[in-house]
Swiss-Prot record:
Entry GO MF terms: ferrous iron transmembrane transporter activity
Outcome of gene disruption: Severe reduction in Fe(2+) and Fe(3+) uptake and in cell growth.
Protein keywords: Cell membrane, Ion transport, Iron, Iron transport, Membrane, Signal, Transmembrane, Transmembrane helix, Transport
Pfam families according to UniProt: FTR1
GO terms (BP aspect): iron ion transmembrane transport
Protein name listed in UniProt: Iron permease EfeU
Keyword Ribonucleoprotein: no
Gene: efeU
Length: 481
């Protein structure tokens, strides 16, 4: 296992090292040309500004494909901005032209910062996190100057560039990682209505990230990544294995481990693909999208497991199911569902985990990286074995109640974090309600889009518990008659 892991990490080192050579800044000339246009317009020299704009457009056409590939959102904003500038030149509207050129300058500078954040190879990782912190400070300056449109654009770039630095952050501080992701969503939601809150959220992120930018790595950081990221998936897989063992369902472990293995393969392939085919800033929103979709799907499947557990919580029903050995069709359907849950649970965390490891390559000796990773995986294996062994010793009734509580807890958390990721990806609107609680460790965020579905799940749990208690009360009364 260690030898295979070493080969995988060595391959990732080769891939990451070859993919991380950054090109020269493709838009420095565009920024300079834009400054010349602003100066010409301020001086009232529209002819000179027009000539510079013609040069700018030629340069833009040349660089446009790479800009579009790097950050589609920024490209769309700048392309629309350039179209409006062309119209203002036709109308000879110097006042509008000056405003539009200044807005374009803001977009170009924000994009330039995002390109710097992309450069996360071994010699640039600390500079990247430092640059991210500087981008936070620049965003705060936009807010202080009441330039909210520029601040909103800068926040969008902070979100898409987060993937370039999150590996540095999560390996050093889980608190900084979860708080930063939560704040990014809140910043998107509140920049238009409560910029003063956004300013405080930026200060909090800076305070959390600055110590990390000056810290160093060790094998311990590599060991913590699989433990932190893999524990939730292990909890789901362990519960599934224990349930199917108690149910005496044949070949159940094959299906569940098959789903988990497929999830690991997809995560590894996607992680390598990200480093080879895409830049971090391009993949940033897509990573949030993937995390959101897998989170919500996992929640739906876990809710199915919760219903299944509730239906079989009765000892009589459970013995009846075991005695009659459910129909083969039902077995296959249940096993396929369990395999899919294992797959989603692994993919949900697996892709980010692979990217985190790729981010660590070059930041500490390869022997420490491999040794730390192996140590973390050994801890996961020990926890998994203990979980299954202890689960088999628990009596059937308490086991079902405990399993249902664990499954529904994971369901609530996966749903909350999934919706949160979809908001960061821009699929769902970002909102922040002051009257809603925020407990990131439970996947609870101050958003009605995540809180309402979570409340419905908790309502289901309450109804299930009340229903079960009512049945016991009714059966008890009948026995006393």
């Amino acid at each position: 296992m260690a030898r295979g892991l070493a080969l995988i990490l060595f391959s990732l080192l080769m891939v990451f090292g070859s993919a991380a050579h950054a090109e020269d800044d493709p838009i420095a000339a565009l920024i300079q040309l834009n400054k010349q246009m602003i100066k010409s317009v301020k001086d009232g020299d529209m002819d000179s500004a027009q000539q510079t704009f013609d040069t700018f457009k030629a340069k833009w056409k040349k660089e446009e494909p790479s800009i579009k590939k790097e950050n589609l959102s920024s490209h769309s904003e700048m392309d629309a901005n350039i179209a409006m500038i062309s119209l203002s030149f036709i109308n000879q509207d110097a006042r509008k032209l000056k405003t539009q050129l200044e807005e374009l300058a803001s977009h170009l500078e924000t994009y330039q910062q995002a390109v710097v954040l992309k450069k996360t190879s071994s010699g640039q990782s600390r500079a990247s996190l430092t640059a991210y912190i500087q981008s936070l400070k620049d965003t705060k300056q936009f807010i202080e100057k009441k330039q909210l449109d520029e601040a909103s654009s800068a926040i969008d770039n902070l979100v898409t560039s987060w993937l370039a630095v999150e590996g540095d952050v999560v390996s050093q501080s889980k608190e900084a990682y979860t708080t930063s992701e939560e704040n990014l969503a809140l910043m998107k939601a509140e920049i238009g209505s409560h910029p003063e809150k956004v300013s405080k959220q930026i200060d909090e992120m800076i305070q959390l990230l600055e110590p990390i930018a000056s810290s160093s790595y060790s094998w311990w950081d590599a060991a913590l990544i699989p433990v932190r990221e893999g524990m939730e998936a292990l909890l789901v897989i362990g519960a599934l294995l224990t349930m199917t063992k108690k149910a005496r369902v044949t070949r159940s472990s094959t299906w569940i481990w098959g789903g988990a293995s497929a999830g690991m393969a997809v995560s590894l392939a996607a992680g390598i693909g990200v480093t080879v085919l895409f830049s971090s800033s391009v993949f940033g929103e897509n990573n949030f999208l993937l995390g959101g979709v897998t989170g919500v799907l996992s929640a739906v499947m876990l809710l199915y497991v919760g219903v299944w557990l509730h239906r079989n919580a009765s000892m009589d029903k459970w013995r009846e199911k075991i005695n009659i050995q459910k129909s083969q069709a039902l077995k296959k359907r249940s096993l396929l569902s369990f395999a899919l849950i294992a797959f989603l649970a692994v993919v949900r965390e697996g892709l980010e985990t692979v990217i985190f490891f790729i981010g660590l390559v070059g930041k500490l000796p390869l022997t420490e990286l491999i040794g730390g990773t192996a140590a973390g995986l050994i801890v996961l294996v020990i926890v998994g074995v203990l979980m299954i062994k202890l689960g088999m010793r628990i009596p059937l009734k308490p086991f079902f109640l405990l399993s249902m509580a664990v499954v529904l807890y994971m369901c609530v958390k996966f749903l909350g974090t999934g919706v949160h990721s979809l908001q960061l990806a821009g699929i769902l609107p970002s909102d922040a309600e002051s009257w809603l609680p925020s407990v990131s460790v439970l996947g609870i965020y101050p958003s009605v889009y995540s809180t309402i579905p979570q409340m419905l799940i908790l309502l289901f749990l309450l109804i299930a518990l009340v229903s079960e208690a009512a049945k016991h009360f009714t059966n008890g009364k009948e026995l006393t008659k």
